[in-house]
Curated annotation (Swiss-Prot):
Entry keyword set: Amino-acid biosynthesis, Aromatic amino acid biosynthesis, FAD, Flavoprotein, FMN, Lyase, NADP
A single BP term in Gene Ontology: aromatic amino acid family biosynthetic process
Family the entry assigns: Belongs to the chorismate synthase family.
Pfam families given in the database record: Chorismate_synt
Protein's name in the database: Chorismate synthase
HAMAP family per record: Chorismate_synth
NCBIfam families: aroC, PRK05382.1
Organism classification: Bacteria, Pseudomonadati, Pseudomonadota, Gammaproteobacteria, Cellvibrionales
InterPro entries from the UniProt entry: Chorismate_synth, Chorismate_synth_AroC_sf, Chorismate_synthase_CS
Cofactor annotation: FMNH2
Pathway(s) this gene product operates in, as recorded in its UniProt entry: Metabolic intermediate biosynthesis; chorismate biosynthesis; chorismate from D-erythrose 4-phosphate and phosphoenolpyruvate: step 7/7
EC number(s) on file: 4.2.3.5
Gene: aroC
Residues annotated for FMN binding in this entry: R125, S126, S127, N238, A239, G278, K293, P294, T295, S296, S297, R319
Chain's role: This reaction introduces a second double bond into the aromatic ring system.
Length: 366
């Protein structure tokens, strides 16, 4: 199919383009009875929206969400929830010079090869602008998970170019424009971004996303393993080129005696697996990292070709994020929440009546 829908029981279908009239989504499968308002959703949209600092794109969108259906008298009804965000600050003329050119490392070339036509204005459907609706849908999932099951999904920027985070203070994440959990690293990030802006270049980043309070048992082996679904969801985010669950690629250098998460009656002694064993949640924190590439929408000229195959020099004049990772934290949170929400409903549907006397092992013995 066309790939615009995610989920099996809790489904999200998004629509809209970067410079179109609006963005929208349909959330189907949300259980009835969840207290929900536009403000509940707006909180996360405001964390993601552009134009809030000198370090992100200066395109200014209010991203005011409208709930069109599925909510009555402040509660979800169990019917499809329709949501809409109007685009108000498009500047399509910035892209007229590249309408027949393929920007290097963008989806321009591949979209033309696949569809034979493309919306060149701001990348059209391939733009990260689309993720606003993922955040809106994810806000619903996050609220249901927390209100009804005590599951909390949070994230932070763990690396910006060469600046790595060593200390995590959750209270600091929303206190700076980087979603940085270490206040002592913010000045270094600011200086790095100032230099980058002067050079007209861009940089990559790493985001860490964590879900706490997840019960054991979520995940559907074999092909819908929880970690496989999380990787799928996170890789679907624009610019993501790598996903790690738990220790990820660091396991290459670990020995089995260190990597195995030993178990005691008091709880697990470590969490190298990132809260997932055999594709099923273990009850520990679910931890994932994503690596986002540097955007190639630059003021620095780059070589490419046009739609006729002629060599051209491409310079992007539009407004862009010099580091797409700065605003990606709410997006990563949303995608992890959507996976957990879908699997929670799937687990309840198939295994809700399962009874056993196996004790629940505490997430950590520490």
């Amino acid at each position: 199919m066309s790939g615009n829908t995610y989920g099996k029981l809790f489904t999200v279908t998004t629509f809209g383009e970067s410079h179109g009239a609006a963005l929208g989504c349909i959330v189907d499968g949300c259980p009835p009875g969840l207290e929900l308002s536009e403000q509940d959703i707006q909180i996360d949209l405001d964390r993601r929206k552009p134009g809030q600092s000198r370090y992100t794109t200066q395109r200014r969108e209010d991203d005011q969400v409208k709930i069109l259906s599925g909510v009555f008298e402040g509660k979800t009804t169990g019917t499809p929830i329709g949501m809409l965000i109007e685009n108000t600050d498009q500047r399509s003329k910035d892209y007229s010079n590249i309408k027949d050119q393929f920007r290097p490392a963008h989806a321009d070339y591949t979209y033309m090869q696949k569809y034979g036509v493309r919306d060149y204005r701001g990348g059209g459907r391939s733009s990260a602008r689309e993720t606003a609706m993922r955040v809106a849908a994810g806000a619903i999932a996050k609220k249901y998970l927390k209100d009804f099951h005590g599951i909390e999904v949070r994230g932070y920027l763990s690396q910006l170019g060469p600046v790595k985070i060593e200390t995590v203070d959750w209270d600091q994440v929303d206190q700076n424009p980087f979603f940085c959990p270490d206040a002592s690293k913010v000045p270094a990030m600011e200086e790095f971004m100032k230099t980058l802006n002067k050079e007209g270049d861009s940089i990559g980043a790493k985001i860490t996303v964590v879900a706490t309070g997840v019960p054991p048992g979520l995940g559907e082996p074999i092909f819908d393993r929880l970690d496989a679904e999380i990787a799928h969801a996170l890789m679907s985010i624009n610019a993501v080129k790598g996903v790690e669950i738990g220790e990820g690629f660091a396991v290459v250098e670990q020995r089995g005696s260190k990597h195995r998460d030993e178990i005691t009656p008091e709880g697990f002694l470590s969490n190298n697996a990132g809260g997932i064993l055999g594709g099923i949640s273990s009850g520990q924190d679910i931890i994932a990292n994503i690596a986002l590439k540097p955007t190639s929408s630059l003021h620095i000229p780059g070589r490419s070709v046009d739609v006729h195959g002629n060599p051209v020099e491409v310079v992007t004049k539009g407004r862009h994020d010099p580091c797409v990772g700065i605003r990606a934290t709410p997006i990563a949170e949303a995608m992890l929440a959507l996976v957990l929400m879908d699997h929670l409903l799937r687990h309840r549907g198939q295994n809700g009546g399962v009874q056993h006397r196996i004790p629940v092992i505490p997430a950590s013995a520490k």
